Amino acid sequence: GVVLFAKTSKALARLNEMFRVGEVKKTYWAIVKNCPPAEEGELVNWLVRTEKQNKSYAYDTERTNAKKAVLHYKVIARSDNYYLLAIDLKTGRHHQIRCQLAKMGCPIKGDLKYGFPRSNPDGGISLHSRSAEFIHPVSKQPVSIVAPVPADSLWKAMEQMKR
């Protein structure tokens, strides 16, 4: 998936600030087994992180120590057994996508921690940092970075079916 590195400490400070204020649009792809309740939608939950379990829990209403989490999802492909979701992350919380999709009834393929029944053969989960877009802080030109899908037959098939 997409990983950004800064060449200098000044560039790192600028990049970190852009992430902090939401100037970087991050898109993720996730493969889920269950059909989402709608073709697209916005999920708004309050997440509580547990350090001991290294897990977050999603609630529909505000809670003490909870942080608001917002994402937008859209079904962009489907196979006989799985759905490919494009996820536009509005906030960046601990395990946010994993937690919110599980709360919606759509745990990510291979994600045992958040309710998928079995692991993937490689032990990973089917969540991919697909792209990052932002305005370059110096040149003011748009920057768009798109990562290829993982070298896995299901990912390749889902990408081919993408609408």
Model regions and ranges:
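RNA pseudouridine synthases
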Residues: G1-R163
